[in-house]
């Protein structure tokens, strides 16, 4: 077969090597002999041509005398390219060249397209260079193909530059070129440039269509700019562009997520009036949005309307609703929805099961959560890392850290990789159970496995070390964190300052507190409370009062903890008048005495250090 493709004055091995490198021609055998001439076969149409038929036709054309024109070969190559057999096309082009059939600009554009589709832009530009060298002038189609090639490789800036070059060369970009570039810009998040390009399209004399606007709307909605998306939607209307149900659904979903339900419902009613029928995605977005906003009856009504219109809710619809019910603490309704989807023959997916397992765990129904987990596995639905993390977290909260650890070890055997959240959950569980060594070992395992600890991970470990009397170890880690130039929020500093105060190192805590402004970190109410508490514990009541005043001057509003700490400190220091003043100020601010303050007052009443009227003042 290969021999028949080779001109008499060439060696078989050369062409065979080319075909082996550029195509998979040699893998096809048993090619049937053509009964029709190549002209008849081309005339009869070669849409969706099969590989073997294409090779057979190419052989027939090569054997014909006189040889077919480049136009005939281009028709074949173009048809094969549409079937995405790019290597085969390039092999045909090489075969043409070997048989003395010159490539014209159309042939070379086909080759450029194939190389672009294969993400081999260097080869594409090599063909373009050859075209220029042969005196051919690339047309809009050639340039559009290269623009698409740049976009496929994510090289959008170069695609933009090429379009600008086209304009300079008096080659006007066509609608496909500009739409391709707009899509590429949107994929890179460069929406503002895409919008400018749409306006430029009008200058080029093109009318943008729904395909042009689609990527821009999608990107705006994904980035949470639903207001801008709605504005663009209105602009489409002004330009008499009819939006599709997909585009309506995208904008409606974005508006629902932003809480703009009135706008979402208005758009929904608008599409209905225009005769555009809502689909399962449209309804799912609206139902989920209404339920998220607590409008359960409206959501249920829309679900009934959806079913009444024979738009069957899919697993995505049910899963979204179940998740909303679980988050709102409506586990009973979530279970009813689950039963409904089973009745309708809709198989739950991992997201569905995860939501229900999470719901059971939040209600402290660990037994039911495990039953749902077992059911999930029995139905052939594989648990993911989220499933395991939910259960591990629930075990840890129930003080069953060892069970959580057993489940954690099961993760690896299932081929799953624990993430930062999974490790954080277990490290916290061990710390809260007082199993500090286990927490430290797990932290080291996390690091050795290449799972990067987050600031939250470090915070959990530092807090555990401080609470269990290992301040020095906590300070070692804290120092390493500072040297690593990790961005430390006020939460980390609060843990260390609190640990220092608990270890009676109030002066060290004060030094760290005073250095916060130099580090560009602003103290919050917790920082002030911890520091005021430390000063009170040390007996430095005047310094605590000064810090309380500074706290208010700096615009940090005291909370009930602040007042209760100071009230107890003043009562313990025989500062009855100042205690009364603080109580009155606290009540004006809408706070009340906590259990520790009330207990202290009752104790002082019992040994007659306070009058009963003081207790009445607290109420």
Swiss-Prot record:
Q: Does the keyword field hold Transit peptide?
A: yes
The yes or no answer to whether the keyword Mitochondrion is present is yes
Cell location? Mitochondrion
Q: Which UniProt keywords apply?
A: Mitochondrion, Repeat, Transit peptide
| One Pfam family linked to the record | PPR_1
Q: Tell me which GO cellular component terms the UniProt record holds.
A: mitochondrion
* PPR repeat boundaries on the chain: 69-103, 104-138, 139-173, 174-208, 209-243, 244-278, 279-313, 314-348, 349-383, 384-418, 419-453, 454-488, 489-523, 524-558, 559-593
Cite the residue span of the transit peptide: 1-28
This protein's major location comes to mitochondrion
The UniProt entry's sequence similarity note says: Belongs to the PPR family. P subfamily.
Q: Which PANTHER family match?
A: PENTACOTRIPEPTIDE-REPEAT REGION OF PRORP DOMAIN-CONTAINING PROTEIN (PTHR47933:SF45), PENTATRICOPEPTIDE REPEAT-CONTAINING PROTEIN 1, MITOCHONDRIAL (PTHR47933)
The name of this protein is Pentatricopeptide repeat-containing protein At3g22470, mitochondrial
**Species of the source:** Arabidopsis thaliana
Q: What is the lineage of its organism?
A: Eukaryota, Viridiplantae, Streptophyta, Embryophyta, Tracheophyta
């Amino acid at each position: 077969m290969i021999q028949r493709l080779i001109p008499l004055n060439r060696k078989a091995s050369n062409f065979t090597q080319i075909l082996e490198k550029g195509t998979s021609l040699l893998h096809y055998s048993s090619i049937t002999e053509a009964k029709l001439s190549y002209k008849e076969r081309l005339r009869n149409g070669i849409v969706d041509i099969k590989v073997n038929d294409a090779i057979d036709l190419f052989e027939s054309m090569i054997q014909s005398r006189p040889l077919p024109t480049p136009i005939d070969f281009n028709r074949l190559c173009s048809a094969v390219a549409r079937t995405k057999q790019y290597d085969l096309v390039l092999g045909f082009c090489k075969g043409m060249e070997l048989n003395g059939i010159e490539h014209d600009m159309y042939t070379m554009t086909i080759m450029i397209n194939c190389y672009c589709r294969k993400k081999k832009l260097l080869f594409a530009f090599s063909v373009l260079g050859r075209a220029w060298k042969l005196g051919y002038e690339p047309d809009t189609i050639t340039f559009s193909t290269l623009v698409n090639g740049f976009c496929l490789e994510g090289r959008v800036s170069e695609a933009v530059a090429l379009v600008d070059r086209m304009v300079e060369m008096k080659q006007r970009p066509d609608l496909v070129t500009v739409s391709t570039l707009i899509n590429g810009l949107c994929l890179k998040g460069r929406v503002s440039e895409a919008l400018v390009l749409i306006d430029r399209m009008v200058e080029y004399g093109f009318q943008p269509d729904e395909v042009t606007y689609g990527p821009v709307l999608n990107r705006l909605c994904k980035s949470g700019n639903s207001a801008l998306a709605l504005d663009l939607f209105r602009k489409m209307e002004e330009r008499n562009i009819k939006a599709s149900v997909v585009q309506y659904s995208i904008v409606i979903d974005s508006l629902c997520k932003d809480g703009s339900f009135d706008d979402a419902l208005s758009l929904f009613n608008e599409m209905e009036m225009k005769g555009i029928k809502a689909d399962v995605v449209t309804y799912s977005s609206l139902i989920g949005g209404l339920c998220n906003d607590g409008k359960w009856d409206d959501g249920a009504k829309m679900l009934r309307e959806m079913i009444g219109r024979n738009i069957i809710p899919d697993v995505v619809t049910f899963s979204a609703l179940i998740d909303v019910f679980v988050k709102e603490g409506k586990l009973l309704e979530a279970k009813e929805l689950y039963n409904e989807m089973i009745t309708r023959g809709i198989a739950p997916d991992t997201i569905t099961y995860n939501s229900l397992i999470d719901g059971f765990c939040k209600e402290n129904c660990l037994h039911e959560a495990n039953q749902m987990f077992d059911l999930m596995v029995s139905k052939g639905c594989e648990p993911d890392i989220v499933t395991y993390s939910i259960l591990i977290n629930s075990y840890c909260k129930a003080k069953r850290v060892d069970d959580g650890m057993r489940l954690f070890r099961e993760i690896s055997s299932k081929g799953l990789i624990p993430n930062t959240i999974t490790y954080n959950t277990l490290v916290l569980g061990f710390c809260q159970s007082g199993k500090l060594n286990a927490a430290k070992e797990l932290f080291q395992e996390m690091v050795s496995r290449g799972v990067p600890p987050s600031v939250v991970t470090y915070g959990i470990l530092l807090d555990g070390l401080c609470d269990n009397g290992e301040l020095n170890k906590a300070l070692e880690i804290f120092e390493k964190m500072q040297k690593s130039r990790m961005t430390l929020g006020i939460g980390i500093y609060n843990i260390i300052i609190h640990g220092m105060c608990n270890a009676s190192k109030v002066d060290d805590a004060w030094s760290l507190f005073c250095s916060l402004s130099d580090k560009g970190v602003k103290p919050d109410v917790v920082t002030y409370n911890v520091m005021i508490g430390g000063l009170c514990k040390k007996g430095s009541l005047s310094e605590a009062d000064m810090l309380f005043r500074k706290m208010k001057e700096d615009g940090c509003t005291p909370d009930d903890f602040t007042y209760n700490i100071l009230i107890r400190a003043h009562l313990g220091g025989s500062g009855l008048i100042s205690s009364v003043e603080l109580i009155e100020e606290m009540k004006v601010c809408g706070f009340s005495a906590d259990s520790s303050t009330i207990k202290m007052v009752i104790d002082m009443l019992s040994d007659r250090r306070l009058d009963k009227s003081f207790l009445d003042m607290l109420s």
